[in-house]
Amino acid sequence: MKYALLSDIHSNLHALEACLAHAKAQGAERMAVLGDLVGYGAFPAEVVARCQAIQAEGGIVLRGNHEALVQTHSVNDASASLSLGGQTAQWTHDQLSPAQRFWLEILPLTACEDSMLLVHASADAPERWRYVEDERTASLSLDAATQDPAVRYVFGGHVHHQSLFYRGTGRQLMRFEPSPGVAIPTPKHRHWIATVGSVGQPRDGKPRAMYALFDSTAAKLTFQRVAYDHMAAALAVREAGLPEFFAERLETGR
């Protein structure tokens, strides 16, 4: 099965549609959205509707911290970036229908299938929204996930960067630097953990959208970058009256 792994869409409909089209062209058979559908961007209702359609078609959709933020207008996380998200929480809440807000509230935090654990943040405490950003935090997440012996792969988002770690000889965790579009063999005799990047708000200085393809049959992972009309997405943020900083982020990828 070939999975498209998409995370951190952040109400960016332009980026989401571009990634979905790209994934289908690459032969993706199942879509998995790993949380943070909303926040920051100008199209929360449209993105939620698109993700509801993905779920109805048999795809996976998980809850992220920005779904929690919309529900409560607060989140248990000390990150300064989430306080910026809080600036749009009420606006985002008001754009969504009651049915959409309820659907976001009942989304699961994790999903497990085909040797994979899917999660928005860290598998060691999914509801705490911890970042997987280095060998130490990746190891914590991987250790928790692999308490289930069926799990060989952990895929998440949250950090808005693409990264890959694997457990080598013994228990040492190794970091692998991925290149976009290059299929990486991920044999099942090892344990792997990856962050798939952000569809709707990349933060590595490049505005192209990010997602990943995982072929569970061939045991290969491919990180993808997709060009989309990020200037139109930024203009929509401005026209919605949202903070200028969010528009600039789309233009610069930071």
Predicted segments, located by residue:
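N-terminal active-site segment of His-dependent metallophosphoesterases
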Residues: 1-57
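Active-site neighborhood of phospho(di)ester-bond hydrolases with catalytic His/Asp-centered motifs
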Residues: 6-7, 31-36, 40, 60-65, ...
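Acidic, His/Gly-rich catalytic cores of divalent-metal-dependent hydrolytic chemistry
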Residues: 169-254
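Beta-strand-turn-beta hairpins that frame and shape the catalytic cleft
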Residues: 1-4, 111-118, 187-193
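Anionic-ligand binding region
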Residues: 137-154, 159-183, 189-192
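Short beta-strand scaffold segments in enzyme catalytic cores
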Residues: 110-113, 162-166, 210-214
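Active-site neighborhood of divalent metal-dependent phosphoester bond hydrolases
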Residues: 48, 54-150
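Active-site environment of divalent metal-dependent phosphoester hydrolases
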Residues: 10-15, 39-42, 66-71, 124-126, ...
